[in-house]
């Protein structure tokens, strides 16, 4: 009996030691990055791609109708774009608009995903686009020019009578702002669904565990330990979100703030209904927030406002006198002249391209790093859960043998 007890206790200690080692390794997983461990990170990222591909194949195997409709849509799109026919004249008319919609929605998604490490496409793309439209409209005193396609930003033959108003410029850029905002709302969906699924699984496991504990050892309410502050707060948060509801989420989504980066995870975790979450997020981000940012850029890059600001800066900082104004004049000359597409880029243009390249590279690396870290931590969590279940099975045996 004594020998048997010693073996059981030894196994229990080994399991606890292994759990501790895995917990420590989980912390070290955060240091696995493409920059420091390129071979290891690339290897695990390929495993993730393989698992994702297998999961996708299994998903569509159980949903043949969905696969059929996706294939049908892709086939019709291919025929409409590439097969010659009468429909091509209509496609030519709307193809630029469709491609631009896809472009801005895609940039919005890239800006929203990544939990704060996403590609800040408003600063890199939408903001400069709105600024360019504003500069062109106020310089030419007209909004009768294309902003997309081969014939974009060509000076109109005549100026508009009565001048260009703020609202005219806003109408010129509002579709780009709307589609970009829609993309940022769509980018909140993956973390919402992941958190919602994890929460539902967790609730099921938690309910089963509580039921098992109640069956094995019933406890009176008086004997139950007092709940900690964190437990009490976690119970009140869902009620708080429920009380805020649609308009609370709408208010958070409408104001540019870093607190909304975790909105998808938060709402998914507390099981906020999908349409309440997505509807409020879509209106807040696409209609309100994107237009607030667009209005700010239009006001800031109006030629008159810009000239006043530059004059003020040059008066206050003598070092910058006659250095900012020539840059503005150069941009005005670019707008008023037809520049060859093959003309060499300026130093500023090359520097901006380098900034874009570095930002996109960092964004892609952060996706790889976070995916690999999450994959490795999940593997460790599964091992820990398995060891804990073994430990729970051994503890009753140990109790019986001690008796």
Curated annotation (Swiss-Prot):
Transmembrane helix among keywords: yes
Protein's name according to its UniProt entry: Vacuole membrane protein 1 homolog
Gene responsible for this protein: vmp1
Gene Ontology BP terms: aggregation involved in sorocarp development; asexual reproduction; autophagic cell death; autophagosome assembly; autophagy; contractile vacuole organization; endoplasmic reticulum organization; endoplasmic reticulum unfolded protein response
Disruption phenotype: Mutant cells display defects in the protein secretory pathway and in organelle biogenesis, and are deficient in their ability to initiate development upon starvation. The contractile vacuole, which is necessary to survive under hyperosmotic conditions, is non-functional in mutant cells.
Keywords, alphabetical: Coiled coil, Endoplasmic reticulum, Lipid transport, Membrane, Transmembrane, Transmembrane helix, Transport
Species assigned in the record: Dictyostelium discoideum (Social amoeba)
Catalytic activity: a 1,2-diacyl-sn-glycero-3-phospho-L-serine(in) = a 1,2-diacyl-sn-glycero-3-phospho-L-serine(out); cholesterol(in) = cholesterol(out); a 1,2-diacyl-sn-glycero-3-phosphocholine(in) = a 1,2-diacyl-sn-glycero-3-phosphocholine(out); a 1,2-diacyl-sn-glycero-3-phosphoethanolamine(in) = a 1,2-diacyl-sn-glycero-3-phosphoethanolamine(out)
Cleavable signal peptide: none
Primary role: Phospholipid scramblase involved in lipid homeostasis and membrane dynamics processes. Required for autophagosome formation: participates in early stages of autophagosome biogenesis at the endoplasmic reticulum (ER) membrane by reequilibrating the leaflets of the ER as lipids are extracted. In addition to autophagy, involved in other processes in which phospholipid scramblase activity is required.
């Amino acid at each position: 009996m004594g020998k048997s007890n010693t073996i059981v206790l030894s196994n229990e200690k080994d399991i606890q030691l292994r759990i501790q080692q895995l917990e420590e390794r989980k912390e070290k997983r955060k240091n696995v990055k493409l920059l420091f461990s390129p071979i290891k990170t690339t290897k695990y990222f390929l495993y993730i791609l393989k698992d994702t591909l297998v999961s996708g194949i299994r998903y569509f195997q159980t949903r043949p109708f969905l696969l059929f409709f996706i294939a049908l849509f892709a086939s019709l799109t291919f025929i409409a774009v590439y097969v010659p026919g009468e429909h091509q004249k209509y496609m030519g008319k709307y193809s630029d608009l469709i491609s631009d919609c896809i472009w801005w929605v895609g940039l919005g998604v890239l800006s929203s995903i990544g939990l704060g490490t996403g590609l800040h496409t408003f600063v890199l793309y939408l903001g400069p686009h709105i600024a360019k439209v504003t500069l062109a409209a106020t310089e030419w005193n007209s909004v009768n020019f294309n902003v997309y396609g081969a014939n974009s930003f060509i000076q109109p033959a005549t100026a508009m009578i009565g001048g260009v108003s703020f609202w005219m410029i806003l109408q010129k850029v509002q579709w780009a702002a709307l589609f970009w905002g829609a993309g940022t709302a769509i980018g909140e969906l993956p973390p919402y669904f992941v958190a919602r699924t994890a929460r539902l699984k967790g609730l099921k496991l938690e309910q089963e565990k509580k039921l098992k504990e109640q069956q094995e050892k019933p406890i009176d309410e008086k004997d139950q330990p007092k709940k900690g502050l964190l437990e009490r707060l976690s119970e009140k948060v869902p009620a708080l979100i429920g009380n805020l509801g649609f308009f609370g989420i709408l208010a958070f989504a409408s104001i540019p703030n870093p607190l909304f980066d975790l909105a998808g995870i938060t709402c998914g975790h507390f099981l906020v209904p999908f349409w309440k979450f997505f509807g409020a997020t879509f209106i807040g981000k696409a209609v309100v927030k994107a237009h607030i940012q667009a209005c700010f850029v239009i006001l800031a890059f109006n030629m008159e406002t810009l000239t006043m600001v530059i004059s003020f800066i040059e008066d206050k900082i003598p070092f910058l006198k006659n250095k900012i104004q020539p840059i503005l004049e150069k941009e005005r000359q670019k707008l008023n002249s037809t520049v060859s597409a093959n003309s060499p880029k300026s130093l500023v243009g090359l520097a901006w391209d380098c900034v874009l390249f570095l930002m996109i590279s960092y964004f892609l690396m952060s996706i790889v790093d976070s995916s690999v870290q999450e994959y490795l931590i999940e593997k460790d969590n599964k091992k820990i859960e398995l060891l804990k279940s073994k430990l729970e099975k051994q503890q009753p045996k140990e109790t019986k043998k001690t008796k």
